[in-house]
A protein has these predicted regions:
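Non-catalytic terminal accessory/regulatory regions of metabolic enzymes
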Residues: 1-97
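Catalytic beta/alpha-barrel core
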Residues: 6, 142, 158-169, 178-191, ...
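Conserved, mostly hydrophobic/aromatic
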Residues: 53, 100, 125, 174, ...
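Short, well-ordered coil/turn segments that N-cap beta-strands
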Residues: 93-95, 121-123, 155-161, 176-178, ...
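Active-site mouth loops of central-metabolism enzymes
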Residues: 95-112, 135-140, 160-164, 183-185, ...
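Glycine-rich, proline-tolerant flexible connector loops at the mouths of alpha/beta enzymes
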Residues: 126-144, 299-310
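Alpha-helix-loop-beta-strand connector modules within alpha/beta enzyme cores
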Residues: 139-163, 195-202, 251-265, 311-333
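Catalytic alpha/beta core domains of metabolic enzymes, predominantly
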Residues: 199-298
Length: 337
């Protein structure tokens, strides 16, 4: 249930009303925007009569919500959420680009890529240390050593770092990571979602290969229900009958997610197609669809990359793309971070 309070409702009376609701065993998601003050009730509200709610002098109106997600629901929180990653803001009119190699291969490689993407305008540095691969014989990443190299690249550039966590046992290793990524294959790893929800670092949650938008948002709800509401959603393409591309980018899903939820939505055009030549056009389309950011793979020598070289841009290609993206973001009235 959503309760809209009167703008001039006295704080004392609002607190008293909230205490009454909490005494009924309900959790309250209190969202105060520029024009509205909303109480989102989480729990069993079937026994609460709307007439009883409306009789309270602080209440403007109320309505029941059918969606299973509450904290992530835009009806509970009408204003866009802004997630701050070490000073880089994403959402609410703020646009950020995350860039870097799919996997960390050496200190020289990650440092060079970091310096180039930062100079081109990327706000955050990505780099895979733990790699979930389809084949057990493929490169699995440099693991904890890779994390150390990623931190060195952060020191060299000042850019906050983003990397993927594979399981709950790795969480202590991620204390110095600025934005923790939960990958597509772990989107419904509920124990991992709860674990990252219990810590305070922002979380980048990628959509699963064959998950609906509601399932995607419900995974974000798992994180938020544990107390961490700094969640960024990432559309990275879904599996369809089409075989000419690695995945199919769901740009309609980006638009729909902004209607469903107040959380920021970024797009990964690299994984969405699997072809570097397609990445620039998909990135431009994502901005036009209202994305709050991009996540792009950049490698100094894609032909020799140990992971996903075919979808990685060179630093020069990324430079050229960023020149266009910067103008496009400005055209659509967003602020480039």
């Amino acid at each position: 249930m959503i309760i809209v309070l009167k703008q001039d409702a006295p704080d004392v009376q609002v607190r008293e009303f909230c205490h009454e609701l909490e005494d009924m065993g309900l959790q309250i998601n209190d969202s105060k925007g520029s024009d509205t003050h909303i109480l989102g009730l989480i729990g069993d509200t079937k026994a609460i009569a709307e007439s009883w709610v409306l009789a309270n002098p602080v209440v403007e109106t109320c309505r029941r919500v059918s969606e299973p997600y509450k904290k992530a629901n835009r009806k509970f929180h009408p204003d866009d959420s802004v997630v701050d990653v070490e000073g880089v803001k994403i959402g609410g009119g703020n646009f950020a680009v995350i860039a870097g190699p799919c996997s960390i291969e050496s200190e020289e490689q990650i440092t060079y890529c970091a310096q180039r993407v930062k100079a081109a305008g990327a706000s955050l540095l990505r780099g895979g240390a733990f790699k979930p691969r389809t084949s057990p014989y493929s490169f699995q990443g440099m693991r904890s050593e890779g994390l150390d190299l990623l931190k060195l690249a952060r020191r060299a550039t000042g850019a906050p770092i983003v990397t993927e966590i594979m399981n709950t046992e790795h969480l202590p290793l991620f204390e110095n990571v600025d934005l923790i990524q939960v990958g597509a294959r772990n989107m419904q790893n509920f124990e991992l979602l709860k674990a990252v929800g219990r810590q305070k670092k922002p979380v980048l949650l990628k959509r699963g290969l064959a998950n609906t938008l509601e399932e995607f948002v419900m995974s974000a709800e798992y994180i938020m229900a544990e107390g961490n509401e700094n969640v960024i959603l990432c559309e990275r393409g879904i599996r369809t009958f089409e075989t000419s591309m690695r995945n199919t980018l769901d740009l309609a899903g980006v638009v729909m997610l902004h209607k469903m939820t107040h959380l920021p939505v970024v797009v990964d055009p690299s994984h969405a197609c699997g072809h570097a030549w397609m990445v620039p056009e998909l990135a431009k389309a994502a901005v036009a669809a209202g994305a709050d950011g991009l996540m792009i793979e950049v490698h100094n020598d894609p032909a020799k990359a140990k992971c996903d070289g075919a979808q990685s841009l060179t630093p020069d290609q990324f430079d050229e793309l960023m020149g266009f993206i910067r103008k496009e973001v400005e055209f659509f009235g967003k602020k480039m971070n």
